[in-house]
Amino acid sequence: MNIWMLLLALSATLTVSADPLAGFRYEDATKFQIINKGWDNTTEPYTRLPQQYMDSCREEQQWLYNHSSGIAVRFATNSKRIAAQYNLKNNFHMQHMAMTGIKGTDLYYLNEERNVWEHVNTARPQEKNFKADSIQSKLYVENLDGEMHEYMIYLPLYDGINWLQIGVDSTAELTMPRVENPRKMGKIVIYGTSIQQGG
């Protein structure tokens, strides 16, 4: 094998093995705005009910208490790349639903010209042998314009998380949202089947 073939093979190997999550600065998502919770006084940041209501809930409802359905984190950044790492509570499997629906996360970007949220990407969880307490990592997007934009990460539907870290370029700004969107205009309660929440 001549030297050029060897260099080409090494170059291809290095390209394939390069870590797409390298060089990020991660910050705890609780530093930013957590939205879509009915109460702020929950025992953990990504659960939906205060502990005081748990005694009156059936066991099946207590299981759902740990699911982060509907909860999202709002932030603004000028990073050219955005990633996330999160720690799943249960990491279980359902035969009838894709893992993205059970324990994936979704990144949205606010198109300020149109005043609409646009889907950017979804974290497709790795099985990790279905061990509870597994850590998931995702590079959502890269090659952004480097301007400040508003973002939102929706948390898993049928699982919960212990913690979430937002990853940005090491020199990028990562701040609380600058725009109130969605706006707080009172509370809405919707009662229905699992179809209501996207199941």
Kindly give the residue locations of the regions a language model identified.
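N-terminal secretory targeting modules
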Residues: T15-K187
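Catalytic nucleophile-elbow at a beta strand-turn-alpha helix junction centered on a G-D-S/GDSL motif
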Residues: M185-G199
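Bacterial Sec-dependent N-terminal signal peptides
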Residues: M1-P20
